Amino acid sequence: MLKIGSHVSMSGKKMLLAASEEAVSYGATTFMIYTGAPQNTRRKPIEELNIEAGRKHMELNGIEEIIVHAPYIINLGNTTKPETFQLGVDFLRMEIERTSALGVAKQIVLHPGAHVGAGADAGIQQIIKGLNEVLTPEQTVNIALETMAGKGTECGRSFEEIAKIIDGVKYNEKLSVCFDTCHTHDAGYDLVNDFDGVLNEFDKIVGINRLQVLHINDSKNVRGAGKDRHENIGFGHIGYKALHHIVHHPQLTHVPKILETPYVGEDKKDKKPPYKLEIEMLKNGTFDEGILEKIKAQ
């Protein structure tokens, strides 16, 4: 079974149940959530996440595994503000606890961090320090380090940087990787003409067994732009053919594929989620040039 889904919202009183219902309405077989707002520290208590009802709904609809994304405010790479670094450590610990309580997620996707001007080496050492403070041999969920585009002072823009972080962490069996197609393309990897070569390079440097999550996004920018701007499937510089190849790649069948493509529409208040039709299009193997109009008409 193809494990494909998108980012969905866990909100209101229904929480996990609402997220599962949204995912099922898109024809998804997995999904990704934040356990609260990605840009702040406000979090509902675990008891209010409606876990039991959410899990029951998932089970009825054949969804076995989901992904959690850590909030953006975590920056383990910050060497200049100890309070920012400490917030990241404390908050990541809490996210591990919340994700464990869900019982259906094995991976927490984390942007490794930004060095905010101290240089990549200093940032990477700080990220290693943070992960060494957070990870324990007992934890049941992994931290999936996301491949980054290289925007600003982001660390993790190359497979070598990801490998350097992993190598420095004591309990690194608790680390995996989330491979983001837009980010790796924007960082300079040639997914369009040589994805197999890129995957082999990843295997040599990091190890393909660590690749546990895929973010499937097209890119608004040319390869190597270092920008990180997602585009709808088939309308960017990666294109439908390459993304379809990645989604159905025989070495990645077990890996959950998560779409984070932009909502569609000119009216900011009435943008439509593209996921139902994009998932359908990635399943059926044919690019639909009129898909954006169909999404708007939903």
Curated annotation (Swiss-Prot):
Protein name as catalogued: Probable endonuclease 4
Function: Endonuclease IV plays a role in DNA repair. It cleaves phosphodiester bonds at apurinic or apyrimidinic (AP) sites, generating a 3'-hydroxyl group and a 5'-terminal sugar phosphate.
HAMAP family hit by this protein: Nfo
EC class name: hydrolase
Binding positions for Zn(2+) 1 per the UniProt entry: 69, 111, 146
SUPFAM superfamilies: Xylose isomerase-like (SSF51658)
Ligase recorded as keyword: no
Highest rank taxon of the organism: Bacteria
Transmembrane domains' residue ranges: none
Binding residues for Zn(2+) 3: 183, 228, 230
The record's free-text note on cofactor binding: Binds 3 Zn(2+) ions.
NCBIfam families: nfo, PRK01060.1-1
Reaction(s) the record says it catalyses: Endonucleolytic cleavage to 5'-phosphooligonucleotide end-products
Enzyme Commission code: 3.1.21.2
Family: Belongs to the AP endonuclease 2 family.
GO MF terms held by the record: deoxyribonuclease IV (phage-T4-induced) activity; DNA binding; DNA-(apurinic or apyrimidinic site) endonuclease activity; phosphoric diester hydrolase activity; zinc ion binding
Taxonomic classification: Bacteria, Bacillati, Bacillota, Bacilli, Bacillales
Cofactors named for this entry: Zn(2+)
Gene Ontology biological process terms from the UniProt entry: base-excision repair
Keywords recorded for this protein, A-Z: DNA damage, DNA repair, Endonuclease, Hydrolase, Metal-binding, Nuclease, Zinc
Residues that hold Zn(2+) 2 according to the record: 146, 180, 215, 260
